[in-house]
């Protein structure tokens, strides 16, 4: 009998999330325990999600049942930079549903979060995973696990046929696919197959629960929300990125050193990423715009600062596939270290299935708007066009980024 792709519970436990939510949560506990934030859900495909509201609400209510077990806490205790006070807090943590609002507005599903950053930060990944899987249960209920497995092995065959043994030995790939996965069981199977059969170097997953299950190190550092929040936390807007990086450095003392560049734009980021930060951080993460142009720009920045790019790593995570990863790898190989975090194309690539394009983004911090502009016009996110205009003015951001792939 074929194995079902759907488990009874969509979100398995509190660790069924991306690792960077925990690393940011610790930094919030230590630095911003009283900051209030707002988040909003957006579906980028024109898809009617209203029929799924009741089931989404049911699954969301089950989040409130989750808490960390002694074994799960003991796994986190082995991660040296997670501090005892944070782990004690996590041991007591429960999802508080009073901060979450769902319903229908203007003919569309809405999901909003409003509350203390410390208490809403963990909602994002499980909420997106719930929306994705609930929708897939309705639309693709006949799907079986074998379809996902076969599709993954077809990708391995392509990679083996198109990359040399030497290239494969250096091609580092990680799973970043929790939030838009087809289902938990599909992600579990994909990560298990990657660990045992990937022809390149599988370096791990961002999913903390699956890292624990497969005895691997969870991967991740920071997300856009960390830099976005500082737009309303720092003394001056122009200093907001520096404030975000400074706070991260104080929290982690050189650990977790991959910085995200495109919250405003990479040009604006590199203007703040001076010799101090460039020496201290291990590398940079790409999440929008032309990846090879971005890589060239980062290499040039390190050279300008007198830093050997081969001592640094670039992590790519923007809508990647294995062919796209191989193309980027070949373009930059031997000049800087590269690694690839692949999400939807691993955990929601099944023949006949259309993956969702959904996000849940911070829209306000302490009652004031925050924004992500990014290196790609379609990825700008802000409720307040006046604030976006002000942000562009302060950081001298042109209408089209120098890294936009849509030029």
Swiss-Prot record:
Pathway entry: Cofactor biosynthesis; NAD(+) biosynthesis; nicotinate D-ribonucleotide from nicotinate: step 1/1
Keywords noted in UniProt: Ligase, Phosphoprotein, Pyridine nucleotide biosynthesis
Cystine connections: none
Post-translational modification: Transiently phosphorylated on a His residue during the reaction cycle. Phosphorylation strongly increases the affinity for substrates and increases the rate of nicotinate D-ribonucleotide production. Dephosphorylation regenerates the low-affinity form of the enzyme, leading to product release.
Gene3D superfamilies, A to Z: nicotinate phosphoribosyltransferase (3.20.140.10)
Enzyme Commission number, as recorded: 6.3.4.21
Domain of life: Bacteria
Biological process according to GO: NAD biosynthetic process via the salvage pathway
GO MF terms, alphabetically ordered: nicotinate phosphoribosyltransferase activity
PANTHER family with a match to the protein in the record: NICOTINATE PHOSPHORIBOSYLTRANSFERASE
Stated role: Catalyzes the synthesis of beta-nicotinate D-ribonucleotide from nicotinate and 5-phospho-D-ribose 1-phosphate at the expense of ATP.
The protein's name: Nicotinate phosphoribosyltransferase
Originating species: Pseudomonas fluorescens (strain Pf0-1)
Gene: pncB
């Amino acid at each position: 009998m074929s194995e079902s792709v759907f488990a009874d519970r969509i979100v398995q436990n509190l660790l069924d999330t991306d690792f960077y939510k925990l690393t940011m949560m610790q930094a919030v506990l230590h630095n911003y325990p009283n900051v209030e934030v707002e988040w909003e859900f957006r579906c980028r495909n024109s898809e009617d999600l209203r029929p799924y509201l009741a089931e989404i609400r049911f699954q969301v209510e089950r989040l409130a049942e989750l808490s960390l077990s002694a074994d799960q806490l003991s796994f986190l205790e082995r991660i040296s930079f997670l501090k005892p006070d944070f782990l004690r807090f996590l041991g007591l943590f429960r999802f508080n549903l009073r901060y979450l609002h769902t319903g229908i507005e203007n003919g569309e599903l809405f999901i909003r979060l409003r509350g203390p950053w410390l208490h809403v930060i963990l909602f994002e990944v499980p909420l997106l995973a719930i929306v994705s899987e609930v929708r897939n249960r309705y639309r693709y209920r006949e799907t079986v696990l074998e379809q996902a497995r076969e599709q993954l092995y077809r990708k391995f065959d392509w990679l083996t046929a198109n990359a040399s043994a030497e290239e494969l030995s250096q091609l580092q790939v990680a799973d970043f696919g929790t939030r838009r996965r087809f289902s938990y069981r599909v992600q579990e199977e994909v990560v298990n197959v990657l660990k045992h059969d990937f022809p390149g170097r599988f370096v791990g997953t961002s999913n903390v629960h699956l890292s624990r299950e497969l005895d691997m190190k969870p991967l991740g550092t920071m997300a856009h929300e960390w830099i976005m929040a500082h737009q309303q936390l720092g003394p001056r807007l122009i200093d907001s990125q520096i404030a975000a990086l400074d706070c991260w450095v104080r929290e982690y003392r050189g650990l977790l050193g991959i910085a995200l560049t495109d919250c405003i734009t990479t040009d604006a980021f590199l203007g703040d990423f001076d010799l101090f930060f460039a020496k201290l951080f291990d590398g940079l993460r790409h999440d929008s715009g032309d990846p090879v142009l971005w890589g060239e720009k980062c290499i040039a920045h390190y050279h300008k600062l007198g830093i050997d790019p081969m001592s640094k790593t670039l992590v790519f995570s923007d809508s990647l596939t294995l062919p796209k990863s191989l193309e980027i790898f070949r373009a930059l190989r031997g000049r800087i270290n590269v690694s690839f975090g692949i999400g939807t194309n691993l955990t929601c690539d099944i023949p006949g299935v259309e993956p969702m394009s959904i996000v849940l983004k911070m829209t306000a911090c302490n009652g004031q708007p925050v924004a992500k502009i990014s290196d790609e016009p379609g990825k700008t996110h802000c409720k307040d066009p006046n604030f976006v205009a002000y942000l562009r003015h302060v950081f001298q951001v042109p209408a089209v980024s120098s890294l936009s792939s849509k030029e």
